């Protein structure tokens, strides 16, 4: 591994780095046939990220003039010219819950023209075999993009390292210029404490939780409630709630026209209509059984569950934000006011999906963002991975500014 990594890091990559024009058209590398297979078998949610429009949108969000990534230019003061250079080598530590999400940071590493090392646990070696088999069988490249695709592949190196291989992990860490770390609390702490260069930039996406909120003014009819429910199921079922942007609690503002019982039944109907493609993990199933038993002891609580606990709705009469149990499980409760919600929010809340009136959003976002919440997507769009993420515009930390 050491020789391979050293060789990759020492590559003279200036001529091999694709230009922004080439990278922003990367989705065209896929023919219609291969694109459909790619979506079905592996990384469907990544495709929108590869489209030219999204590439340009992300670049515009991160930089006043993203063309500075290609060429020097005058910036504001005519006496100052700036040029954005890549930091060098970006090391992407793959997340354990939803490993393919880390490809989003890889894409941004490519856009900023860094060399990219993807550190994969041996646990996920089979996952990448499936992805690359899919590519081999279905990936058709238009001939005019062959050079671009080769440049992209030359900018990426995948290495398998296990969690207990400290020597190998430290070697990767100390030879990187950017560390993009995805993972839980224990993993993030362990990786962060590895030796690194003094000027190495860390971009950390640590453990986060998310929830959803309904205002009493938003739902006036049963039709409104059904529309909400059909949108909400998209957020809950995505990645079986393993993503940090998946809601685990649904908070309804007190005073709505509908009781929690009525709301839970309509949500359950939407859950029943959704096809489930993955089986419940045995450990999670055991945890769900324990939760079901615990909550059934409280007379005020009630539970709606699918066969084999494929999804669960815990109806909680006393407002409280509960720890996730995963596998499409929701805790439904009612908060007296926004103030009560603010007081109950966990410190590591990432996203709050909103189903509120547009006129209410500025006040709600202002109040809840004071508690450290970074994202307020609309219900149905919580699972969209967009910039900024966890309060970061990652590409700003992937480049260094040259002035002259």
What are these regions (language model features)?
Residues 12, 27-30, 136-139, 143, ...:
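Structural signal for hydrophobic packing residues in well-ordered secondary-structure cores
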Residues 72-237:
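Rossmann-like NAD(P) dinucleotide-binding subdomain of oxidoreductase/dehydrogenase enzymes
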Residues 102, 164-165, 337-338, 360-361:
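Amphipathic coiled-coil/heptad-repeat helices and related helical stalk/stem segments
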Residues 121-126, 356-359, 383:
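Short beta-alpha junction loops
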Residues 183, 356, 380:
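Residues that line or immediately flank small-molecule/substrate-binding pockets and catalytic motifs
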Residues 230, 238-353, 362-404:
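NAD(P)-dependent aldehyde/semialdehyde dehydrogenase
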């Amino acid at each position: 591994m050491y020789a391979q990594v050293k060789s990759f890091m020492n590559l003279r990559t200036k001529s091999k780095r694709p230009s922004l024009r080439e990278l922003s058209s990367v989705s065209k590398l896929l023919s219609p046939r291969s694109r459909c297979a790619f979506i079905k078998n592996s990384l469907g949610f990544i495709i929108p990220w590869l489209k030219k429009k999204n590439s340009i949108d992300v670049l515009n969000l991160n930089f006043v003039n993203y063309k500075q990534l290609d060429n020097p230019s005058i910036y504001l003061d005519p006496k100052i010219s700036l040029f954005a250079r890549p930091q060098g080598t970006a090391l992407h530590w793959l997340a354990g819950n939803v490993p393919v999400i880390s490809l989003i940071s890889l894409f941004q590493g490519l856009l900023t023209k860094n060399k990219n090392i993807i550190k994969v646990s041996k646990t996920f070696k089979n996952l990448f075999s499936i992805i690359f088999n899919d590519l081999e069988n279905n990936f058709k490249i238009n001939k005019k993009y062959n050079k671009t695709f080769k440049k992209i592949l030359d900018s990426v190196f995948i290495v398998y390292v296990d969690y207990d291989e400290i020597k190998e992990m430290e070697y990767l860490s100390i030879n990187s210029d950017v560390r993009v770390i995805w993972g839980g609390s224990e993993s993030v702490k362990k990786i962060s404490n590895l030796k690194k260069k003094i000027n190495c930039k860390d971009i950390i996406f640590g453990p986060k939780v998310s929830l959803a909120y309904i205002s009493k003014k938003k739902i006036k009819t049963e039709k409104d409630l059904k529309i909400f429910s059909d949108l909400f199921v998209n957020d809950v079922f995505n990645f079986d709630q393993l993503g940090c942007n998946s809601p685990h609690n649904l908070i309804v503002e007190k005073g709505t026209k509908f009781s929690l019982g009525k709301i839970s039944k309509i949500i359950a109907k939407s859950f029943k209509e959704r096809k489930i493609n993955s089986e419940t993990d045995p450990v999670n199933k055991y945890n769900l059984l324990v939760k079901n038993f615990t909550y059934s002891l409280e007379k005020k609580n009630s539970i709606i569950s699918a066969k084999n606990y494929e999804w669960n709705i815990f109806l909680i009469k006393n407002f409280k934000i509960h720890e996730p149990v995963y596998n499409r499980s929701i805790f439904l409760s009612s908060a007296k006011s926004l103030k009560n919600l603010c007081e109950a929010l966990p410190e590591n809340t990432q996203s709050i999906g909103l189903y509120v009136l547009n006129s209410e959003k500025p006040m709600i976002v202002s109040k809840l963002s004071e508690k450290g919440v970074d994202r307020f997507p609309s219900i149905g769009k919580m699972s969209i991975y967009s910039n900024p993420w966890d309060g970061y515009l990652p590409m700003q930390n992937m480049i260094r500014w040259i002035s002259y």
